[in-house]
Structures are given as structure tokens and as C-alpha cells.
Amino acid sequence: MKIKLSPELAYVIGLWRKRRSFEGLGVKGDESLLQTFSQEALDRQLTTSDKLLTTEDKVYFYHTAYRKFFQEVEEEQLERFKYLNEYSANYLAGMFDAAGEVTEKGVVMIHRCNQQDELLFLRLGFQTRKVSDRMILERPLVFLAFIKNYVKVTKEHKVFSYLDKKKK
């Protein structure tokens, strides 16, 4: 089975990358994150509803080919997401939905980041500052405008409605 990367699959990989569960291929987190991952996995036909396993804070399924593909994309993220396009936007939106935060002061950060993530953001033109395992974006509005059409978990956040008002 040959698996091909699509923008929608890039979003799922971004979610999985920051919130992966130890069992199978899945994520752990709050209800909205689990619901989004489940819906995306079913919509992309990664699995069927009877093979989707859930616990209190995890949702996952077993599929060796997809697991290997997700791991390959993770290892090659600097090459696969080197352009400002729909693939990169979906991947970063998935990462932001899984581990991103906008504070009350408007600081945009992504938790659970490593040097490879920092390099990916820098290559795409997003200046960052790393503080322990968090990555703070220097120009948050540019980043949020780039991913706003692709976020699913955090799409109701007030910062995205602010961006829509500012655009008009």
C-alpha cells in the first residue's frame, strides 16, 4: 500500500506529532482534540470506526503502514515542509491545535518543541525564541494568519476572529 502525503493528512500528522499516545497510532488530550483526531482519521479513511479504540483521555488505532509513514514524515519534516504552502500550513495548524497556546497578553507559543521544530519554523520565515520546551513566536499575527484557515480545535479562539476583523 503506497501512502501519499496530502494537506489533510499533514494536519493529522501535526496533531499526532505533538500529542501522540503510546498505544497504536493516536493522540492523548482533552475531548475536543480526541474528537478532532477521530473525525479526521475517519474522514481520511485511515481506519474504520470499529477499529478506533478510545479510553478516557486517548484515541488510537493500529496500522503499521500508517505508523511507519507518520514516522518517516516526522523524520523528514525539514524537507517535506520547506515551502509556505498548504502542506506546511496544515502541518503547523495540527501542531498548534495539539500543543499551541495564545496567552491573555497575546503571546503565541507552542509547547513540546525541539531543535528540529525550531529549525522548521525558521526555514519557513517565522522568527522564534525557545524557552525550555516552549517556542514563542516573535511575530504571532503573521503565523496565525498563515494557519487560520486550517486549524480545527482552536478555530473558535478570539484571536482568529480578531484576524478576520483586521483583514476587512
Predicted features and spans:
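Internal intein/HINT superfamily modules and their associated LAGLIDADG
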Residues: 1-168
